[in-house]
C-alpha cells in the first residue's frame, strides 16, 4: 500500500458553492459537499474558530477627547457620558491598508449627532459603518476626539492597549480586530451516486465588510493549511508524468458514465439495474416505449430520467454507432475525467 492512499482515496468536495446574502460584501452561505463522514464537523469547527480568532483587521486602540482626563468623566453639553462614548467607539468598523498605528480625528459642534461618518480619515482608512452613532451634542456643545487605529487579530482588551508611557487623557479601547462578526455551521447527510453516507457542510458567515465572507473562509483555510504543515514529516514521491494517449471515440465520452452515478431515485436506479442498463450509452438508445415496458417503471421515473439526460444534452432514442465497444470497462476508466 502506498502512503498516498491515506489521503488520495478520501472523497473531496467537488466545489464550494457560495450564495451571497442581501449584502454580498457582508453576508454569504457556503456549501461544501461531499465530505467523508465526520469531516463536516471537523472542518466546520476548525474554520469557525479560525474565522473568529485569527483573521487580521483594523480597529480603534485608544481615543483622546479634548478636556477629558479619564473615561469616568462627563462632558458639558454631551448627553452620553464618556463610558458610553467609549463603548460606541468600540463598535466602529474599519478597513485599513498598510501598517499602523494611524490617526483619525472627529470635530463637531452641536446641536446634532456625532456619527462614525463624521470622522476625518486619511486615504487608506475607510469607515465601514458611517451611520454608527457615537454621541449627541446639545446646542453650543463642541467635541474633538483623536483616535489611534492599528491592525491586529482577534480581540484585545483595553488594558493591553494602554502603553506604559501613556499621556494623561489617553483612554484605551477594547479592540475587535476580526473582520468576521458571526459564523455558524451545520452538517447534513448528502449523497454521491447511490451512497448516502457523506457529509454536507453549510457555513453562514457575516463580516463587517472589510472582507467578503468567501475571502474570509479562504484566508481561514490557508491559516489552517499553514499550521498543519509542521505535522507532515515526509516528502511525497514525485509522480512521473506520462502523456496518456486518449483514443478517438465514435461516440460521446459521456456514454461511458455508469447510470448508478446519476442522481436518480432509488426506484428508478433499481429499475435500470434490473433491466441490465449499466452505462448511459445503454440508456440513451432506449425509446420511451421500451422504458415504460420495464417492470415497475412508470411515467414518474421516465420523466426523472429524461430530465437528468436533458441536463447533459442527451435524450432517449439516440443512435450510438460503435456501441458497445469491446473494451468498455477499460475505456470507462480512462475517460472518467472527461465527462
UniProtKB/Swiss-Prot annotation:
Q: What InterPro entries does UniProt report for this protein, alphabetically?
A: DNA-dir_RNA_pol_insert, DNA-dir_RNA_pol_RpoA/D/Rpb3, DNA-dir_RpoA, RBP11-like, RNAP_asu_C, RNApol_insert_sf
Q: Where is this region: Alpha N-terminal domain (alpha-NTD)?
A: 1-235
This entry's Enzyme Commission designation comes to: 2.7.7.6
Map out region (Alpha C-terminal domain (alpha-CTD)) in residue numbers.
Answer: 251-339
Keywords, A to Z, come to: DNA-directed RNA polymerase, Nucleotidyltransferase, Transcription, Transferase
Question: Which Gene Ontology BP annotations are present?
Answer: DNA-templated transcription
Statement: the UniProt record of this protein carries the keyword Nucleus? no
User: What is the top EC class of this enzyme, as a single word?
Assistant: transferase
CDD domains, per the entry: RNAP_alpha_NTD (cd06928)
The molecular function GO annotations come to: DNA binding; DNA-directed RNA polymerase activity; protein dimerization activity
Entry coiled-coil feature ranges: none
Enumerate the catalysed reactions: RNA(n) + a ribonucleoside 5'-triphosphate = RNA(n+1) + diphosphate
Residues crossing the lipid bilayer are none
**Would you name any one GO CC term?**
DNA-directed RNA polymerase complex
Name the family the entry cites.
Answer: Belongs to the RNA polymerase alpha chain family.
- Give the comment on domains: The N-terminal domain is essential for RNAP assembly and basal transcription, whereas the C-terminal domain is involved in interaction with transcriptional regulators and with upstream promoter elements.
What job does the chain carry out? DNA-dependent RNA polymerase catalyzes the transcription of DNA into RNA using the four ribonucleoside triphosphates as substrates.
Q: How does it assemble?
A: Homodimer. The RNAP catalytic core consists of 2 alpha, 1 beta, 1 beta' and 1 omega subunit. When a sigma factor is associated with the core the holoenzyme is formed, which can initiate transcription.
Protein name listed in UniProt: DNA-directed RNA polymerase subunit alpha
